[in-house]
Amino acid sequence: MKSDLAIVILAAGRGTRMRSSTPKVLHNIAGLPMVAHVLRGAQLLKPCKTIVVFRDVRVEQYIRNTFPDVLTVAQSDALYGTGFGVFSAIPWIRSESYGNTYPNTRHESHAEYELDACDLDTCNPASDRLNDQESLKGGRHIHTKSGDVTNNKPFPSRVLILYADVPLVPFQLLEELVRKPLKQAVGAIVTTHLDNPKGYGRVMRDNLGSIAKIIEDSNILPEQSINEVNTGVGIFDTEYLQDALNKLLKCHIAHSPNQDCVTNQDCVTNQDCVTNQDCVTNQDCVTNQDCVPAAHTEAHVLSPKVIVTEQIHKKAESEHQHAGQWMCRQDTVGAQNTKEEMRLTDIVEYFYNNGLRVNSITTSDSELLLGVNNRVQLAKTEKILNDQIIKRWQLYGVTIKSPETTWIDSTVQLSEDVLILPGCILSGRTRIEEGAVIGPFATISDSFIGKNTIVKRAEIIDARIEEGAVIGPFAFIRPGTVIGKDSKVGTFVEIKQSNIGPESKVPHLSYIGDANIGSHVNIGAGNIFANYDGKLKHETCIDDGVKTGAGNVFVAPVKVGRGAYTGAGSVIRDDIEEGALSLTELKQKTIPKWAENRGDG
């Protein structure tokens, strides 16, 4: 049986504050793009479908290649705001396009949807279906002009909304949000409290505790001391969400003053409203009908429709002493939206003004729920995630001597009794088996490290180190290299695209490139494998049991037979047969008293 949950991940933000040519959600933290962390968490919830709303084609390409079961929907460059983002995904929530059925499906979304409610000119909530909760049960259908979406098919009843730039949302929190029944509510959002909420949308509640609206930071008055903020994570009933977005879109397109998007029943009568100058601040008034009498600012009169804090009450009473003066209503949906965008947060107020409840889950893990907008926040987020990763491995049985100087990607796999010394960086698809000692100051990426190996002050990239091998100090193991069991790669050795057999040694100051070295081989100090002729790379083959002298140069392609020896300083250009000794014979010439004759004294 399919899940009734769909997940929409918003990844269409421009990310200008990152000051980067790379899309914000593709910036890495702990080895993966931010959007990948969000998708991995989403998949654990086992939704019937996951939809990513994107703007940059590079985001789509990444998801196609990495998460083939995820649907991608393009948000038009002409449409701004999180509301438009979710609106773009609605048809594909309702369609039969499941990721596991239609992988790599890309859908264009340019607000071409036919709105089947009232015409724009008669957009009146008093007659709209949102004011008739019984009629809402039948739902409203939104479809594309292409006719891809079928109105009579079953579709997910709930939509979980996540943000691709909020990568640390705990799975336990998402699980609670999804499992907790909405009961009489149309949705639920996740909130948190911040000592300094600057920059985040504030959650305003009535004096019964119900969520009434979310106010953007730029619209908060100095008198409003609200530290409960919206994290952006929320779950909504699909039908109600679609209806709300339908209505908000119509009001947005019509460029109305937005007073039509709420009910006007809170005004005593329109004639009771006077002029905007009688409001607390003129800019807060959209129309006179949005005013309420200053004489009626007691909480029991305003609740639950009009949300005014105690600080505003006091200011109003001090500035408007005589009867008949008015205070500006603060609940006109979208009236304070200074940007040309449709915000998803406006649906909260829209629901409230139509008698529909939005629940909340409040968490103390505020640092895990804040978005990434710039490089400072990116670094902070990565540090938080790294601390979590280190703690998890410590609890699993890995000893990490210096958590403060150790960085481990989320994709790394460690085993029990691994010892990580200070200054190590483990990244990519690295896997380290039990008993290995890593560090100090080792960098390992996309590599396999076998049991009981030692890697000290070395860099290893896309390589395989078998059980019992010793690497370093100051060794550089490059891609395509395999170091055999119980082998040794010593100080200042670089190895690239080579196989080193079991119990072989490359102990000192050597470059090994494009080589196959057998077992029980000893490579003398200062050996160079000359593998490049200026156009092509060539291979050197060293058979089992070979011993090479110091300072050898092997000019590839060349083969050295089993058990052969080479003399110090030899340049090996030709193949050497099994068991032979090969020397580059240069007659030594000695000049007596040379230094004295030179005048060295």
From Swiss-Prot:
<feature type="binding site">
    <location>
        <position position="216"/>
    </location>
    <ligand>
        <name>UDP-N-acetyl-alpha-D-glucosamine</name>
    </ligand>
</feature>
<keyword id="KW-0133">Cell shape</keyword>
<feature type="binding site">
    <location>
        <position position="522"/>
    </location>
    <ligand>
        <name>UDP-N-acetyl-alpha-D-glucosamine</name>
    </ligand>
</feature>
<keyword id="KW-0573">Peptidoglycan synthesis</keyword>
<dbReference type="GO" id="GO:0000902">
    <property type="term" value="P:cell morphogenesis"/>
</dbReference>
<feature type="binding site">
    <location>
        <position position="525"/>
    </location>
    <ligand>
        <name>acetyl-CoA</name>
    </ligand>
</feature>
<feature type="binding site">
    <location>
        <position position="75"/>
    </location>
    <ligand>
        <name>UDP-N-acetyl-alpha-D-glucosamine</name>
    </ligand>
</feature>
<keyword id="KW-0808">Transferase</keyword>
<comment type="subunit">
    <text>Homotrimer.</text>
</comment>
<comment type="pathway">
    <text>Nucleotide-sugar biosynthesis; UDP-N-acetyl-alpha-D-glucosamine biosynthesis; N-acetyl-alpha-D-glucosamine 1-phosphate from alpha-D-glucosamine 6-phosphate (route II): step 2/2.</text>
</comment>
<feature type="binding site">
    <location>
        <position position="373"/>
    </location>
    <ligand>
        <name>UDP-N-acetyl-alpha-D-glucosamine</name>
    </ligand>
</feature>
<feature type="binding site">
    <location>
        <position position="568"/>
    </location>
    <ligand>
        <name>acetyl-CoA</name>
    </ligand>
</feature>
<dbReference type="InterPro" id="IPR050065">
    <property type="entry name" value="GlmU-like"/>
</dbReference>
<feature type="active site" description="Proton acceptor">
    <location>
        <position position="508"/>
    </location>
</feature>
<keyword id="KW-0511">Multifunctional enzyme</keyword>
<feature type="binding site">
    <location>
        <position position="373"/>
    </location>
    <ligand>
        <name>Mg(2+)</name>
    </ligand>
</feature>
<dbReference type="InterPro" id="IPR029044">
    <property type="entry name" value="Nucleotide-diphossugar_trans"/>
</dbReference>
<feature type="binding site">
    <location>
        <position position="201"/>
    </location>
    <ligand>
        <name>UDP-N-acetyl-alpha-D-glucosamine</name>
    </ligand>
</feature>
<feature type="binding site">
    <location>
        <begin position="81"/>
        <end position="82"/>
    </location>
    <ligand>
        <name>UDP-N-acetyl-alpha-D-glucosamine</name>
    </ligand>
</feature>
<keyword id="KW-0012">Acyltransferase</keyword>
<protein>
    <recommendedName>
        <fullName>Bifunctional protein GlmU</fullName>
        <ecNumber>2.7.7.23</ecNumber>
        <ecNumber>2.3.1.157</ecNumber>
    </recommendedName>
</protein>
<feature type="binding site">
    <location>
        <begin position="531"/>
        <end position="532"/>
    </location>
    <ligand>
        <name>acetyl-CoA</name>
    </ligand>
</feature>
<keyword id="KW-0460">Magnesium</keyword>
<keyword id="KW-0677">Repeat</keyword>
<feature type="binding site">
    <location>
        <position position="165"/>
    </location>
    <ligand>
        <name>Mg(2+)</name>
    </ligand>
</feature>
<dbReference type="GO" id="GO:0016020">
    <property type="term" value="C:membrane"/>
</dbReference>
<feature type="binding site">
    <location>
        <position position="478"/>
    </location>
    <ligand>
        <name>UDP-N-acetyl-alpha-D-glucosamine</name>
    </ligand>
</feature>
<dbReference type="GO" id="GO:0009252">
    <property type="term" value="P:peptidoglycan biosynthetic process"/>
</dbReference>
<keyword id="KW-0961">Cell wall biogenesis/degradation</keyword>
<dbReference type="InterPro" id="IPR025877">
    <property type="entry name" value="MobA-like_NTP_Trfase"/>
</dbReference>
<dbReference type="InterPro" id="IPR005882">
    <property type="entry name" value="Bifunctional_GlmU"/>
</dbReference>
<dbReference type="GO" id="GO:0006048">
    <property type="term" value="P:UDP-N-acetylglucosamine biosynthetic process"/>
</dbReference>
<dbReference type="GO" id="GO:0071555">
    <property type="term" value="P:cell wall organization"/>
</dbReference>
<keyword id="KW-0963">Cytoplasm</keyword>
<dbReference type="InterPro" id="IPR011004">
    <property type="entry name" value="Trimer_LpxA-like_sf"/>
</dbReference>
<dbReference type="GO" id="GO:0019134">
    <property type="term" value="F:glucosamine-1-phosphate N-acetyltransferase activity"/>
</dbReference>
<feature type="region of interest" description="Pyrophosphorylase">
    <location>
        <begin position="1"/>
        <end position="375"/>
    </location>
</feature>
<dbReference type="Pfam" id="PF12804">
    <property type="entry name" value="NTP_transf_3"/>
</dbReference>
<comment type="function">
    <text>Catalyzes the last two sequential reactions in the de novo biosynthetic pathway for UDP-N-acetylglucosamine (UDP-GlcNAc). The C-terminal domain catalyzes the transfer of acetyl group from acetyl coenzyme A to glucosamine-1-phosphate (GlcN-1-P) to produce N-acetylglucosamine-1-phosphate (GlcNAc-1-P), which is converted into UDP-GlcNAc by the transfer of uridine 5-monophosphate (from uridine 5-triphosphate), a reaction catalyzed by the N-terminal domain.</text>
</comment>
<feature type="binding site">
    <location>
        <position position="511"/>
    </location>
    <ligand>
        <name>UDP-N-acetyl-alpha-D-glucosamine</name>
    </ligand>
</feature>
<dbReference type="GO" id="GO:0008360">
    <property type="term" value="P:regulation of cell shape"/>
</dbReference>
<dbReference type="Pfam" id="PF00132">
    <property type="entry name" value="Hexapep"/>
</dbReference>
